Amino acid sequence: MKSKTFLEKNFINVQAYKYNGDLYRQWNGSKIIKNDSQNIILYNFHSRIMEKSGKSWQVSEPSLWIFPKNENYNVNVLLRPEGNYYYINLTSPFIFEDNTIKYIDFDIDIKVYPKKEIEIVDIKEFQKNIKDYGYPPSVRKMVYKQVQNLLMFYEKQTSFFHRDFIDNIVNSLAKNKMLVFQSKKLSNFSQRYFEELRKNTKNEKIFKVYLCGPTVYDEVHIGNMRSVVVVDLIVRAQKYLGKKTLFVHNITDIDDKIIERSIQSKISENKISEKYFREYKKVLKKYRIKSIDKMPKVTDNIDSIVKFINSLDKKGYVIQKDDGFVFDVSKIKNYGKRLSREDKKQVENFYLWKSTTKGVQYNYNGFLGRPGWHSECTLFIDDIFNSQTLDIHAGGIDLTFPHHENENAQYIAKNDVKITKHWLHVGQVMFKNQKMSKSLGNVILAKDFDEDIFKIILINSSVTAPIYITNELIENAKVIINKYKKLYFKFLNLSLSFNFDDNVRYMVRKIADKDFSSFNLKLNEYIKAYNTSLEADKLTIVSSVIHFLNFSFIEQIEKDFRKNKKIYDIWQGFLKQKNYEKADMFRKILIDQGLI
């Protein structure tokens, strides 16, 4: 099917078959709402279902049906304000013909209930049909493997289980008036759905993290990446220790730098910001940043920012000037208390909204302009975290003042609470004895730097201290990576299993506590203990921690393991035969990959 964007006009049918080719169920009139490179997503309401027996009925509540392309499952999501209900079918990859999605149902299913209970169902039917339909070993193996993958998605809350995946679709349905129903049972559906969502978010004991994000006008360098890699480690550590987390990382997609770039290049602000936002997402993928839950953009939230500034105005914190509106810092008790003497000299009211004649403009009470930088972040925190205090607010150390001080002032003004329990001001990355900066021209682009080397450098540094990038530092990181590779390959070679005992949890807790020094000390103790004793339990602890750190080399080692295991066994075989010449040939292959 031709790729299209959200809210397509056509309706299609769906047919489910048994393995012997019998059609046993059909859905008529499912609306395509999304068709991209990954999924076809259908919206079902009043669709007609027909059974092989002749029985038929109409869908009476809204649901989504997700068909991942080239996967062995599809997902039916019943949308309910009290919580969504997932029904996952294990199937063949679907085909599309005659305006119909067609697939073979392998009977075994997974249910996920609104309170997050998960259940594998119809196992007996699957086992019966192995005999009745003669499922070959390849089908049985595929089904069991897919069940494990889906359970992993659920455990990590990734893919369609991610908190934003369904809610973003529901939000688009609501905006397009597709969740307005005549039925009394479904009255005010979208309002109830999102009220319940906000209530659940507020009531849950969630570890709440916000990290100031980039202005997307150029490619990011490794200095920009330090904060996000550090915070990703901390958030994943909290997840590992059993905490639910909400990690928000904003995107500034309109500001003076973007407008200047637009004027210089004669390309619209939107095209520039979209281009570099795409580039940033590629870099996040390269650096294996997967813990971010929301990435709100300024241009998508102008109306909310306007309402936020109005709320401050009603409380008497806004002063109107000829060129915009400023926040009255004199009304905030202890404003600037944490500042240095030099910073205190620079304390002044700051713009919430500033008039401008250059670039894209928005309207605030008759003033054409743009929101202030400090208001954007404060609004996102207030809106997404339901006016609660964060557990960690992170950013570069250069944002301490005025940005973070001004965010906190606005939050106190609106909500009478501090914006965060803990500030995390990550140290700068220095190159050629200066702060890495585009204006100085001393940058190393993140896309050009090895992500594993960078992570090693960060883990072996204090979170708040500056890092000086040198050839010696990079070479030292390579030595550590090679050591980790050899240990991890040995772990796989011995067919050991990951360990989640107190020793591993202790080290992960040190990452969660931002105590990277103690983490390294303990990890190196276990590496030394293994090298001395060669005890499998020590290697298991070390490898479990290395796996937690989520290096790129892990994926490559696991991908090539079967091939390299054969090479390893051949090498060992020649050693036993004392055929050292041939043994050295195979040993060299493993050495070249850094595996032994």
Curated annotation (Swiss-Prot):
One of its GO terms (cellular component) is cytosol. Its main location: cytoplasm. It catalyses: tRNA(Cys) + L-cysteine + ATP = L-cysteinyl-tRNA(Cys) + AMP + diphosphate. It comes from the Bacteria. Keywords: Aminoacyl-tRNA synthetase, ATP-binding, Cytoplasm, Ligase, Metal-binding, Nucleotide-binding, Protein biosynthesis, Zinc. It is an enzyme of class 6 (ligase). Its EC number is 6.1.1.16. Its cofactor is Zn(2+). A motif ('KMSKS' region) lies at residues 435-439. Signal peptide: none annotated. Residues 1-199 are annotated as: Unknown. ATP binds at K438. Binds 1 zinc ion per subunit. It is found in: Cytoplasm. Zn(2+) binds at C212, C377, H403, E407. GO terms for biological process: cysteinyl-tRNA aminoacylation. PANTHER family: CYSTEINE--TRNA LIGASE, CYTOPLASMIC, CYSTEINYL-TRNA SYNTHETASE. Belongs to the class-I aminoacyl-tRNA synthetase family. This is Cysteine--tRNA ligase.
